[in-house]
Design a protein with these regions (language model features):
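The feature captures the beta-strand-to-loop junction immediately N-terminal to the Walker
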Residues: 35-37
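Helix-to-loop junction immediately C-terminal to a conserved catalytic motif
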Residues: 50
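Conserved small/polar residues in nucleotide/adenosyl-binding loops
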Residues: 170-172
Length: 172
């Protein structure tokens, strides 16, 4: 697995340039941290890399495939936990997971017993509505949803927000 990000550009209107040539490469097994001041475009870059925001220019290739030309690349290769909670608040944790597990071919019930949901402590909260969960539990559930399709690439925006330090250090 190899990711090539080249000259990503994004602006809002004519005067607000958010990204002006972001570039990097990443190989399988590498961790990349995007660091910068508030408002410098970190979240914008991550949203573009996850396929939820369109870039004005540049290229993103995953294993040589142009992700901007084929939106299915994002679905196949990338799991994304955005900064803002992506969960369906009025549904239970279980129903949120079911939504993300559909069409994956994976056994959600087996994962609940010994997979990521069990490791992150989500399994005991499955029947609670998301709007009744703590911020930390919502973040854990969001991570489980992003990992439902077992993507080779996981993008986390503000990964430690709402999580206690011990859980933040667990390597999945």
């Amino acid at each position: 697995m190899f990711i090539e990000v080249e000259n990503i550009r994004k602006s809002y209107g004519r005067k607000t340039i958010v990204l002006n040539g972001a570039s990097f490469n990443a190989a399988s097994g590498e961790y990349i941290a995007i660091v910068g001041a508030n408002g410098c475009g970190k979240s914008t870059l991550l949203e573009i890399l996850a396929g939820s925001l369109k870039a004005d220019g540049g290229s993103l290739k995953i294993d040589g495939i142009d992700a901007f030309a084929d939106a299915l690349v994002f679905q196949k290769y990338i799991g994304f936990v955005p900064q803002e909670n992506p969960l369906m608040e009025k549904l239970s944790a279980r129903d949120n997971l079911k939504f993300w597990y559909c069409d994956t071919g994976r056994n959600m019930d087996a994962d609940l017993q010994g997979g990521v949901p069990a490791v992150l402590g989500v399994s005991e909260y499955l029947d609670k509505r998301v709007d009744k969960l703590s911020g930390g539990m919502k973040k854990r559930l969001s991570i489980c949803c992003a990992l439902a399709k077992n993507p080779p690439v996981l993008i986390l925006d503000e990964p430690g927000a709402s999580l206690d330090i011990v859980l933040s250090l667990i390597h999945i």
